[in-house]
Amino acid sequence: MVSLLRCQSFKPSSSLICSLALSAAFALSSSAFAEETKPAENKPATPVVSPPKATAQPANKNQVRFTKTGTFDGDSVVKLARKLASKPYVVLKDPLPAGLAKLSYDEYRDIRFNPVSSIWRDQGLPFQMQMFHRGFYFQDLIEIAIVEANQATHLAYEPKYFTAGEVITQALPNDDIGYSGFRIHNQLNTNGVYDELMVFQGASYFRALGKGNSYGLSARGLALKTADPEGEEFPIFRAFWVERPSYDSNLIVVHALLDSPSVAGAYRFSVRPGDNTQIDVEATLFPRVELSKVGLAPSTSMFLHSLNGRHDTDDFRPEVHDSDGLLMFNGRGEHLWRPLANPRQLQVSAFSDNSPQGFGLIQRERNYASYQDLEAHYERRPSLWIEPVGNWGQGAVVLTEIPTESEIHDNIVSFWKPRQPIPAGSEYHFAYRMNWGDEPVAKTNSVVVSRTASGRADIAKATPRRLFVVDYHLNGAMPDELPLAKVESSGGVIANVVIARNAANNGYRLAFELEPEDKDLIELRAELKFSTPRQVETWLYRWTL
């Protein structure tokens, strides 16, 4: 089993992801379905240039590689990334003192940032910043600079910023060992209280909150070789430049330098907190090699079980997940809803599109009773909606679902994969808007899937036939007539299709049965047809043994 380890707000280094064998994925040729194809790894490989041989750069006390104090403008990080990509990849060597390098999880948690030392705390600004110490999984030295009036000032490590509890017996170092990341605070929920808004820590991972949310899914700067048998490559944000916010602004801007053996990149994040926190991302990639297995705007989440399929799960909680579905608005004007699954074997699905309008991992179930978890509160986890800026052309929204037996593992990944590889030596620009929160997508006059459940079709005796129940919620007035229901499958036999009003949900319930026959993987598609125009989600599902 391959998964991403979750340690509360922590994300792992790339060493926790190992090579994996792909399960066979079903390829649909019928235009009646959103296309789900086999992973590219199972197709004839396109020759690519091997990454330049990496060299090692030893540590230098108090060395500042990227965030040197000096003039800074909007093009500074782009120039750095371009220069970085023109040279072979360098494995940076910044070893920690032995005591910090071998910290346990509890020991690492015992090193806390002192809120009194928060950046801008004494200036009355709408944002504050706190840094994370290095140690545990977070061995990489991350440089940070503060930008004000086009001047960048390197933020050196200071042991006085941190407090160490009883678990830590040694003194913190005095050398500039850098940081492992940082978090931004804002009066997101209550005036006068600076709550966490956003975190950057671990590889290129980051995550954010809308009003009233608790941390759940994460985003990354870039995905490379996800679900590749040779192993995934994890780029890292090596340095950040954080612009000092204005007194009267609801905006904070973060610049980041990305690096990995295959690519360097420059990122700009414009963050606006709110009920749904909005982050505008502008990125420029400088590939060292051809990027044929690249994912733009990647998100990482967790799905353990729900009414959709529990796989004999022995758990008092009805549902356990950070996200319960992948929502897509494609270039043809369709709205597609694909419930997530915790499969028995690795599944990779590719939904082909041209000029996508939006996609994201959504936590649609907001009722505490559906989770019954007094600590995790999965009903508070944010959804993340990605809106491409400009025409992203041809490609596919790729969904990877990894088997897991524990909620501590992230097992869901989604991203946009361009149809054409990104050439080595090129400059590739793209931009998108992220919305983090309970309801990041407008639902005016729409019919959306609110619940998916499945079970044995005959409760009196064992049968391979499956019963599917799909509930739809109607936003707006309910018409007098029932919609027509259309259910299709790539195999097996569909029977007993029934559509009924659901007064409890102000919507409809679609029920049907599937006889798998000799199939072990079947793609399903359901649509509701109304006599008057309205936006209706198309339900997609992959059934497997």
UniProtKB/Swiss-Prot annotation:
Signal peptide annotation: 1-34
Gene: opgG
Protein known as: Glucans biosynthesis protein G
Entry's localization field: Periplasm
Record region (Disordered): 38-60
UniProt function note: Involved in the biosynthesis of osmoregulated periplasmic glucans (OPGs).
GO cellular component, as recorded: outer membrane-bounded periplasmic space
Keywords: Periplasm, Signal
